[in-house]
Structures are given as C-alpha cells and as structure tokens.
Amino acid sequence: MSKSLNIIWQYIRAFVLIYACLYAGIFIASLLPITIPGSIIGMLILFVLLALQILPAKWVNPGCYVLIRYMALLFVPIGVGVMQYFDLLRAQFGPVVVSCAISTLVVFVVVSWSSHLIHGERNVVGQKGSKK
C-alpha cells in the first residue's frame, strides 16, 4: 500500500509542478504588454528551473513521461480544427509553402552563421593543410 501511495504522490507532484509553471506563465503573459502565449512562458520557467537544478528532474519525470507517451492523442483536436479550415488552407497553399520554405532557409542561414561565429573554423582531423 505504501508503494502505491508513493507512486501516486510522484504523479501528483509532477503534474502540480508542471501546472504551476503553466499558470505562472499565463499570469506573467497577462502582465506583459506584448502577446506571448502563457504556455511558452511556462515552458521557459520549467526549463530554467530544471536547468539551474532548482527543481530536480526526477520530480517532474513521471508527469512528463505520461504527457509524452500520449502526445499523439493530444494532437487529435488540433487536427480536427485544422480540417475545419481545409478550404481556406487549400486556397492559400502556395503562400503557406513559400513562407515555410523561406523561413526554413532563413533558419538554416542564421544557425550556420551563428555556429560559425561561436565555434569558429575548425580543421578536419587528419588534414594538415589544403592541398593545391
């Protein structure tokens, strides 16, 4: 009986911590003059707490495991909502594809530039110099 209570306590603690970060993010988002989703701010709060080891990862692990395990099921309502706007998406297919392609290329360029800026140019292992 004690072991099952301990497992239940771990799940309750995990979900309380996850939801506390979510609601803290929603509260902070309501105070900001710009529109940022509260769930994104809540994820950042949870990330900072975990990265700084203020919050042990083992405390939120059971809840995160459950959410990740059933993540596909959580996307079903979103897919149904998108299907309601199928005609609009079909009419705007070209601009959507072009904007996705351009934004992907911009991300590639920015990441490669920033990686080169941070890490610098590195020599290939085993290569002493460029042969002409």
Swiss-Prot record:
Keywords: Cell inner membrane, Cell membrane, Membrane, Transmembrane, Transmembrane helix. The keyword Membrane applies. The keyword Transmembrane helix applies. It is a multi-pass membrane protein. Pfam families: LrgA. The chain crosses the membrane at residues 7-27, 31-51, 63-83, 93-113. Its main location: membrane. It comes from the Bacteria. InterPro entries: LrgA/CidA, Uncharacterised_UPF0299. GO terms for cellular component: plasma membrane. It is found in: Cell inner membrane. Belongs to the UPF0299 family. This is UPF0299 membrane protein YohJ. It comes from Salmonella arizonae (strain ATCC BAA-731 / CDC346-86 / RSK2980). The lineage of its organism: Bacteria, Pseudomonadati, Pseudomonadota, Gammaproteobacteria, Enterobacterales. The gene is yohJ.
